[in-house]
């Protein structure tokens, strides 16, 4: 299925009775082929989704709530279109379940089927909400740099590295990532952290490159994979990890992580804008 066929950007009828058919899968393949990624992926990782508007009824009719977190493997053939995900989760609102575990298991089954891979699901109960604290990305902020730029479409030629000097290891981040939904044109605001081992990457060029996504249209996952591929090709790091966290839309935030080495999955931190 294509994004144009999805509910995104269209008037929708909201149902409050559970309906798994609302989930709309989109194949990763086409967007990956457009940036030179074939069947052999140059990375592994996960897409972390947080859902803040999940509610259902218990067996006695009393509303229940939870914050849901989904871990979608990067090698899944499909992603779920975000508005369809919102509509799907909304369909739980007037549906009775015996327990929170039953809700979790239902969501895991449905979303895994839509993505074509096993998706991990975690539900945080209200008494644990206090543990959902704000954090910040570790590393050196690129946003401190005072620079000029006028490039607002992705341009890998902005990336420079000291290819003939001794390798370094560093972590940098920026809060200036912005792209746009390819269907609705709505802005997607995010932060991105890059950790690498290899030739020193020019910080000004890297920040200009991140800023260059400002008028780009692409889903969150696709933007992160393009950043990964461009940095890997232009700067030739031996190890590379790219982690982006986007602000929520429709009660959902999406946080893709990609790496080419054995690195633990990142913390599902909550940045200030999330």
UniProtKB/Swiss-Prot annotation:
Pfam families: QueF (PF14489), QueF_N (PF14819). Pathway: tRNA modification; tRNA-queuosine biosynthesis. GO terms for molecular function: preQ1 synthase activity. Its EC number is 1.7.1.13. The active site is at residues 181, 188. Its main location: cytoplasm. Keywords: Cytoplasm, NADP, Oxidoreductase, Queuosine biosynthesis. Substrate binds at residues 80-82, 220-221. InterPro entries: GTP-CH-I_C/QueF (IPR043133), NADPH_dep_7-cyano-7-deazaG_red (IPR050084), QueF (IPR029500), QueF_N (IPR029139), QueF_type2 (IPR016428). Signal peptide: none annotated. NADPH binds at residues 82-83, 249-250. It catalyses: 7-aminomethyl-7-carbaguanine + 2 NADP(+) = 7-cyano-7-deazaguanine + 2 NADPH + 3 H(+). One of its GO terms (cellular component) is cytoplasm. It is found in: Cytoplasm. GO terms for biological process: queuosine biosynthetic process; tRNA modification. Belongs to the GTP cyclohydrolase I family. QueF type 2 subfamily. Catalyzes the NADPH-dependent reduction of 7-cyano-7-deazaguanine (preQ0) to 7-aminomethyl-7-deazaguanine (preQ1). Homodimer. This is NADPH-dependent 7-cyano-7-deazaguanine reductase. It comes from Paraburkholderia xenovorans (strain LB400). The lineage of its organism: Bacteria, Pseudomonadati, Pseudomonadota, Betaproteobacteria, Burkholderiales.
């Amino acid at each position: 299925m294509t994004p144009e066929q999805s509910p995104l950007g269209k008037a929708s009828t909201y149902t409050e009775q559970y309906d798994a058919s609302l989930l709309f899968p989109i194949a990763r393949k086409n967007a990956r082929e457009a940036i030179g990624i074939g069947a052999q992926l140059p990375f592994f990782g996960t897409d972390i989704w947080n859902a803040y508007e999940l509610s259902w009824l218990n067996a006695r009719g009393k509303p229940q709530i939870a914050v849901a977190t989904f871990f979608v493997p990067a090698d899944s053939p499909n992603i779920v279109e975000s508005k369809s995900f919102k509509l799907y989760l909304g369909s739980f609102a007037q549906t009775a379940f015996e327990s929170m575990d039953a809700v979790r298991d239902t969501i895991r089954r449905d979303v895994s089927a839509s993505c074509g891979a096993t998706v991990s699901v975690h539900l945080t109960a209200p008494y644990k909400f206090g543990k959902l604290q704000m954090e910040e990305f570790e590393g050196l902020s690129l946003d401190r740099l005072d620079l000029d730029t006028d490039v607002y479409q992705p341009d890998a030629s902005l990336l420079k590295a000291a290819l003939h000097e001794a390798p370094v290891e560093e972590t940098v981040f920026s809060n200036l990532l912005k792209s746009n939904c390819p269907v609705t044109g709505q802005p997607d605001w995010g932060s991105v952290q890059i950790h690498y081992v290899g030739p020193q990457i020019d910080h000004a060029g890297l920040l200009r490159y991140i800023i260059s996504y400002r008028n780009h249209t692409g889903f969150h996952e696709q933007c992160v994979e393009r950043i990964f591929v461009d940095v890997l090709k232009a700067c030739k790091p031996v190890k590379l990890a790219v982690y982006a966290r986007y602000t929520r839309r429709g009660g959902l935030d999406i946080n893709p992580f990609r790496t080419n080495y054995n690195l633990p999955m990142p913390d599902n931190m909550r940045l200030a804008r999330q």
